[in-house]
């Protein structure tokens, strides 16, 4: 094992035992780290079990060039000079990208790990770590990826849905999100309660949701792009 890999995997490299079932050529494992030696070590490990890999050393290049239609996961370094891993995670969320993320860090930063997990990360590893643990996290992430993509329309699509609302429907939506009843909304906008009900029906249809809870969820995702 080359010496530089020892900082990642304390043991024999690579471990092949019992991992063939993880091979999924339809999935892409993205690796974002500013250390080329780490990129080489991680990509070699992932390729050894038959998975496709795309490596990036720049956060901005990754955010601009990544194939967003591909299903897979992202192995993400926490500390990078251009942009932190948490910032990358936040930007992906703002873009509506639901790719599962596995964080790696050279420091035992518990508060940062808590933030990452709370924001939806699959796992958080501190170097060195066992390769079996990372491969297990990749396995879990690949199980999550199709479900997340099928259940989460992109922000661009949600914004398009929002912009299809009439000015009055957008006004009604604001009161719906504040928890106003139809009667209260009608008084605020000086329209009939029946008209409010029609607007609410149209809002739900255009936003492609079936419940107020879903409406709140999608508009929360839109908040940053509408401000």
From Swiss-Prot:
Keywords: Activator, Cytoplasm, DNA-binding, Phosphoprotein, Transcription, Transcription regulation, Two-component regulatory system. Pfam families: GerE (PF00196), Response_reg (PF00072). Phosphorylation by TodS probably induces conformational changes, which allow or alter the interaction with RNA polymerase in a process assisted by the integration host factor (IHF). Residues 28-142 form the Response regulatory domain. Induction: Constitutively expressed. Is under catabolite repression. Residues 158-223 form the HTH luxR-type domain. Residues 182-201 bind DNA. The keyword Transferase does not apply. It is found in: Cytoplasm. Monomer. This is Response regulator protein TodT. It comes from Pseudomonas putida (strain DOT-T1E).
């Amino acid at each position: 094992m080359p010496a530089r890999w020892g900082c990642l995997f304390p043991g024999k490299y690579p471990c092949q035992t019992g991992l063939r079932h993880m091979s999924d050529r339809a999935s892409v494992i993205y690796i974002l780290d500013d250390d080329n030696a780490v990129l080489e070590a991680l990509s070699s490990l992932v390729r050894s079990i038959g998975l496709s890999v795309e490596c990036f050393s720049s956060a901005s290049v990754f955010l601009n060039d990544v194939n967003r239609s591909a299903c897979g996961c992202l192995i993400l370094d926490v500390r990078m000079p251009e942009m932190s891993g948490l910032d990358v995670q936040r930007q992906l969320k703002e873009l509506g990208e639901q790719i599962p993320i596995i964080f790696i860090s050279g420091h035992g930063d518990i508060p940062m790990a808590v933030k990452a997990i709370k924001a939806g990360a699959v796992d958080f590893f501190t170097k060195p770590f066992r390769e079996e643990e990372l491969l297990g996290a990749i396995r879990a992430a690949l199980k999550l990826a199709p479900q997340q993509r099928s259940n989460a329309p992109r922000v661009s699509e949600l914004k398009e849905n929002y912009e299809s609302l009439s000015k009055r429907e957008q006004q009604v939506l604001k009161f719906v999100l504040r928890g106003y009843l139809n009667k209260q909304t009608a008084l605020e906008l000086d329209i009939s309660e029946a008209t409010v009900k029609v607007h609410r029906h149209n809002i739900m249809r255009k936003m492609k949701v079936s419940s107020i809870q879903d409406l709140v969820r999608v508009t929360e995702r839109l908040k940053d792009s509408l401000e």
